[in-house]
Amino acid sequence: MEPRVSVAEAVSSLTIADAFVRACVGPAPPRPALPSRFICSFPDCSASYNKAWKLDAHLCKHTGERPFVCDYEGCGKAFIRDYHLSRHILIHTGEKPFVCADNGCNQKFSTKSNLKKHIERKHENPQKQYVCNFEGCKKAFKKHQQLRTHQCQHTNEPLFRCTHEGCGKHFASPSRLKRHGKVHEGYLCQKGCSFVGKTWTELLKHTREAHKEEVTCTVCQKMFKRKDHLKQHMKTHAPERDVYRCPREGCARTYTTVFNLQSHILSFHEEKRPFVCEHAGCGKTFAMKQSLMRHSVVHDPDKKRMKLKVRPPRERRSLASRLSGYVPPKGKQEPDCSLPNSTESSSSPEATMLAPAALLTVH
């Protein structure tokens, strides 16, 4: 009997299992599976999980809900898992934290899986690695899924085919078939109406427009239609606000948002206003596209216009009142101290004599 191998020898061998076999030691017993305590309550579904977050992610497949929403302005994409959202946010930030450590490469990637694919294709086996093993073929492919799709030509096996009546479309992978299935099933609105969206984005758009839930600022009670707008507004109440100073020489203007600073530089310093209102008779120009979109509401009768606080027109004061220095209280109409008109003066000599006196007696 050969002596038992050390741990170092076992690790350095091809597999730990081979080392145990050579040492006449049986393989380690499998780890006991954790009990599935979290069971799906939907009818005709027997899925169960050992962790609550796994069940939550599974339930989203039934409800169509995507609870993790990107709060970047103008985005609004939603995801089932929190790490999917974290991965998506890298698109906005441009961050690529995963770097290839191969000599002379240093290529960066936003996800670990993309880095792994890069290493497999470019460094471990830069040649096409998936070869068809059917007799007389030997075609090679870079991706395993491409090989599987190709082999269907040899076996005449149907690809992943849609079973919906009247469709018959087929796909190269089950994930693509599942994604296609939503075209027939759709995304049902969960707000009590019968709307069914063909895509998740379409459902989100419907929810924003048909089921607007305004959110309120807890400080000033101002209301907003979107949470990201409220989040941006809350910065105005922060004790220490970020201030963005104009970098142009001789300009001391400051702004609380990058958007306003960019708009200032483009319109004031560079005199660039490329976005023109195309409404007939308007022709106003703007430095930023968002500013043009905000302005377009003025021309759209179907949209709610901004409720501006309009000051009531100031009453015209008589010459006598202005000369007297008398200031009438706000909200009250001042007494009529106007001078008589020319026709009255000509017809009444008494009025002509009293007119200069009126200027001196009003207090």
UniProtKB/Swiss-Prot annotation:
Biased composition (Low complexity): 338-350
Zinc fingers, C2H2-type class: 38-62, 68-92, 98-123, 130-154, 160-184, 187-211, 215-237, 244-269, 275-299
Assigned keywords, A-Z: DNA-binding, Metal-binding, Nucleus, Repeat, Ribosome biogenesis, RNA-binding, Transcription, Transcription regulation, Zinc, Zinc-finger
SMART domains hit by this protein: ZnF_C2H2 (SM00355)
Main location: nucleus
Compartments (UniProt record): Nucleus
Gene Ontology biological process terms in this record: ribosomal large subunit biogenesis
InterPro entries (UniProt xref): TFIIIA_Zfn-C2H2 (IPR054599), Zinc_finger_trans_reg (IPR051061), Znf_C2H2_sf (IPR036236), Znf_C2H2_type (IPR013087)
Annotated segments matching region Disordered: 301-363
Keyword Transcription regulation found: yes
GO molecular function, one term: 5S rRNA binding
Gene Ontology CC, one term: nucleus
Keyword Metal-binding belongs to the record: yes
Biological function: Involved in ribosomal large subunit biogenesis. Binds the approximately 50 base pairs internal control region (ICR) of 5S ribosomal RNA genes. It is required for their RNA polymerase III-dependent transcription and may also maintain the transcription of other genes. Also binds the transcribed 5S RNA's.
Protein name: Transcription factor IIIA
Record organism: Rattus norvegicus
